[in-house]
């Protein structure tokens, strides 16, 4: 699990412990990106533990608007290509990417390994309004031999927030 947000790290580690997964889940407190071993700015929208809405290396939010920052700091980012290429990690079977609007950058930084047959499925959170990013993700997935299976709404119950966000599920052809 990659979790660069100081707001979310404690919640993640507690959940791993409470679910008896400490021997199965490794936490890396770095951000994934298309830039190799680079310190960039991490922006957070609040100081609430377990919260959403952060941005790494960009100053826009998940809707493409200027990010309203309540907290920011520099943190190390890296590419999946570098982590897998240097055998820091093993190639996973399943990947979930939910990084508040920079999913396309994470996939760019993983391009060398996406065709690997060991990766069976990838779930990617997408904002359908951000057409350039949306189209880039769909193209990368298709070019990497994945097919679209389903999408699930991220809309909060009783709220219009996250109305255009969906978790897209892709499987290897």
Across the structure, where does each feature detected by a protein language model lie?
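Phosphate/nucleotide-binding beta-alpha loop and adjacent structural elements of enzyme active sites
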Residues: 1-173
